């Protein structure tokens, strides 16, 4: 078969990681924020990375390079900037890069500091975005030129470009009203006028196709929102072709509306929802292209290209050149380059594929076009992932036997909360409004250097452990000086709250350069679950008991919960998520038992990821919540009644799942609430949460120091919903990313505010 441009299968990705394989963007951003480099130097790093990443795509043979997927903080904030949609407190007339940073962080090298905008999770991922703020009188004005500059930049380099835009309906959905009494959907006509201008500018730049992302189509949308797409895409129709992109789940429940839209192509995620393919193909209008998202942008596993070929060959036969092949979603969620991972075992390495390698998996398009050599290469490429199913490394009979023996009783504490709290109050003897922190303290340059030197072999294990004990002792003394009530050991030994446990539990592979952006300059390095999971020995007991030996105050044991470990790693794909979570839960249960036996009276099991793990469709939530809650309870249920179990949730908009949060049966839950001005506590207006709660009283993601008055205001607001005897006082989240000066100043305000509140309460009691 002769391949021509007429019948060639077009290849593209929905986006590429932006931080750089060595986190170049992160380090440049942080230098700029500290005033160590000028803005033009930061922009040079961005340009260098964009050209490198376009080169990766072209080098892999992709037909289009994605432009507009680069962002200085996140792509939703980029969209706000593009639309001139700036919160009034940050609006200085003409938006620039420092405007963007002030919206995201509350401060920038120029301009006045003020409250950062809210930040939340991007659908069910561990990526975050800055939430757009909508008011009734909002206007949209295309004023920030970054997208158009990048298109010109890529075209000048000789690339065939496909700009990436967040669609108007999704943009509105992802924001929130800052005023009561109006619906942000009413802003759609005004917003569409701005989008028309954007598309006209792209057309003038010679753009043929625009990728317009509408991921909310995977949700079960309210009727007015679902119907709004018809208006949106009537208005946006023009000479530039629109590829409507959906991802993360099935969209067939909206298919009848989608096929009526005035667009030129549809992208569907066949990694997350392969079952939708036939329905989409059957309904596809005859003049549309179908972009099949078959290269998984959310995992690190090598694609089974032989299977992909089998699935797509009938579609190719039916659609011909109207079939495109793409990534399931943006490759933003994948690490960048597997070639850097020289420390992984050869057996594990051959199962994996990172963003750069995933671009090469579009070899399958050549196979679809009938290239015999490509068909053979697809079979060769797929062989390791097929052989993995029978690898002795993957399956552990003892772990399977233990998980198969799980019963309902294994997930229950030996006493109900009412009895536990009575015993705990007697055993712990804490004051009204106990003060504590969430777990981590600043990871200083000294700590990071010592960890790096230890891993490189420049520091012996004995010397490293001595250094860590010094950092723990320092953290304990600082807490003594601050007069906190419940201490933490500070987690100096942990580089990451999940990776630390992944290194100590059997069943994980840990990478060196597998960084993935979480938000802004914050990157995480998810471990990979390659086999059955179990605990070979205690993981945290030594450090926790050492910290406890240094003080008469209570020191919390600190664990990361099973759902979060699962959610913040790359899971294996041959076991259901519930089964993996139960394996982790049993390992943590053993750790809880050992901490308790060592005299630790408060144990925190963090579950910040429980909300983000929810399926996108609300009708599927309860099934997920049932097994997620059960996994947490399995991990905690070995605790005796007098042992107090804490859990922590951050960025968790859990108002809709409050009953499941209560079902965790944690004695104390701490949550992020300050950035939303305690808005998350609205859940407690209608639901009487039975246990103790610590609503975060200041935002640790901002370097701004809270005042005593601000904290008092937030606690008084919380007190209207939670009885004061069940309130704890704590920051929103861990303090790992802050420096000690900021940390101590903020905690000093928190403790002083608490003492002031106690005095007020005592005066009331008299």
From Swiss-Prot:
GO MF terms held by the record: 5-methyltetrahydropteroyltriglutamate-homocysteine S-methyltransferase activity; zinc ion binding
Name assigned to this protein: 5-methyltetrahydropteroyltriglutamate--homocysteine methyltransferase
Signal peptide span: none
Enzyme class: transferase
Disulphide bridges: none
Function: Catalyzes the transfer of a methyl group from 5-methyltetrahydrofolate to homocysteine resulting in methionine formation.
Keywords, ordered alphabetically: Amino-acid biosynthesis, Metal-binding, Methionine biosynthesis, Methyltransferase, Repeat, Transferase, Zinc
Binding site for L-methionine: 438-440, 491, 606
Gene Ontology terms describing biological process: methionine biosynthetic process; methylation
Residues of the active site: 701 (proton donor)
Organism annotation: Photobacterium profundum (strain SS9)
Family under the similarity heading: Belongs to the vitamin-B12 independent methionine synthase family.
């Amino acid at each position: 078969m002769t391949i021509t441009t007429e019948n060639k299968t077009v290849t593209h990705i929905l986006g590429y990681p932006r931080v750089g394989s060595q986190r170049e963007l992160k380090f440049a951003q942080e230098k700029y924020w500290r005033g160590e480099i000028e803005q033009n130097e930061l922009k040079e790093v961005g340009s260098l990375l964009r050209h490198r990443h376009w080169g990766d795509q072209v080098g892999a043979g992709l037909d289009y390079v994605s432009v507009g997927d680069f962002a200085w903080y996140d792509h939703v904030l980029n969209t706000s900037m593009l639309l001139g949609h700036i919160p009034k407190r940050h609006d200085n007339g003409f938006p620039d890069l420092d405007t963007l940073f002030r919206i995201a962080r509350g401060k920038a090298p120029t301009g006045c500091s003020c409250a950062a905008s809210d930040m939340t999770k991007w659908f069910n991922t561990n990526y975050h975005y800055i939430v757009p703020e909508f008011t009734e009188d909002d206007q949209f004005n295309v004023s920030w030129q970054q997208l158009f500059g990048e298109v010109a930049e890529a075209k000048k380099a000789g690339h065939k470009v496909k700009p990436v835009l967040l669609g108007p309906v999704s943009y509105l959905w992802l924001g929130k009203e800052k005023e009561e009494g109006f619906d942000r959907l009413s802003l759609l006509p005004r917003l569409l006028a701005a989008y028309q201008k954007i598309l006209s500018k792209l057309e003038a730049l010679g753009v043929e196709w625009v990728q317009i992302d509408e991921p909310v189509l995977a949700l079960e949308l309210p009727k007015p929102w679902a119907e709004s797409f018809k208006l949106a895409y009537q208005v946006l129709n023009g000479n530039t072709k629109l590829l409507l992109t959906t991802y993360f789940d099935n969209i067939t429940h909206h298919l009848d509306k989608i096929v009526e839209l005035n667009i030129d192509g549809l992208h569907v995620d066949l990694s997350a929802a392969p079952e939708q393919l036939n329905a989409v193909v059957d309904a596809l209008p005859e003049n549309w292209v179908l972009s099949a998202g078959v290269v998984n942008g959310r995992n690190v596993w090598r694609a089974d290209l032989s299977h992909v070929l089998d699935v797509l060959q009938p579609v190719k036969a039916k659609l011909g050149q109207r079939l495109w092949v793409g990534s399931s979603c943006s490759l933003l969620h994948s690490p960048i380059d597997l070639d850097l991972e020289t420390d992984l075992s050869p057996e594990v390495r051959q199962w994996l594929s990172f963003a750069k390698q995933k671009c090469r998996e579009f070899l399958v398009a050549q196979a679809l076009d009938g290239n015999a050599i490509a068909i053979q290469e697809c079979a060769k490429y797929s062989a390791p992932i097929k052989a993995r199913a029978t690898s002795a490394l993957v399956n552990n009979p003892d772990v399977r036997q233990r998980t198969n023996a799980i019963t309902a009783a294994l997930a229950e504490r030996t006493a109900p909360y009412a009895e536990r709290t009575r015993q705990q109050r007697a055993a712990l003897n804490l004051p009204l409004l106990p003060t504590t922190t969430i777990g981590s303290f600043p990871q200083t340059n000294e700590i990071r250097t010592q960890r790096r030197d230890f891993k490189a072999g420049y520091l012996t294990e004995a010397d490293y452990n001595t250094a860590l004990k010094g950092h723990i002792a320092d953290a304990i003394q600082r807490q003594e000086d601050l007069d906190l009530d419940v201490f933490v050991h500070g987690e100096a030994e942990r580089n990451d709250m999940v990776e630390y446990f992944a290194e100590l539990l059997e069943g994980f592979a840990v990478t060196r350069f597998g960084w993935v952006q979480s938000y802004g300059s914050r990157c995480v390095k998810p471990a990979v679950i390659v086999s059955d999971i179990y605990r070979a020995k205690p993981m945290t007991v030594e450090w926790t008991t050492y910290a406890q030996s240094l003080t008469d105050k209570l020191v919390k044991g600190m664990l990361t919960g099973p759902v979060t470990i699962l959610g913040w790693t790359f899971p294996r794909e041959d076991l259901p998520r519930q089964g993996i979570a139960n394996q982790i839960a049993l390992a943590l249960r053993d750790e809880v038992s050992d901490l308790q036996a060592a005299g630790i009276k408060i144990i925190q099991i963090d579950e910040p990821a429980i909300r983000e793990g929810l399926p996108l469709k609300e009708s599927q939530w309860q099934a997920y919540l049932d097994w997620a809650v059960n996994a947490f309870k399995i991990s905690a249920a070995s605790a005796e009644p007098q042992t107090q179990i804490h859990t922590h949730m951050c960025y968790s908009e859990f108002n809709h799942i409050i009953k499941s949060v209560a079902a965790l049966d944690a004695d104390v839950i701490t949550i992020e609430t300050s950035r939303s001005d305690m808005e998350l506590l609205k859940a407690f207006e209608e639901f009487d949460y039975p246990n103790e709660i610590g609503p975060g009283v200041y935002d640790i993601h901002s370097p701004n120091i809270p005042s005593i008055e601000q904290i008092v205001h937030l606690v008084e607001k919380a007190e209207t919903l939670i009885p004061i005897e069940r309130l704890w006082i704590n920051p929103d989240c861990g303090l790992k990313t802050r420096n000690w000066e900021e940390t101590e100043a903020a905690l000093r305000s928190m403790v002083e505010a608490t003492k002031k509140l106690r005095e007020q309460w005592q005066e009331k009691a008299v």
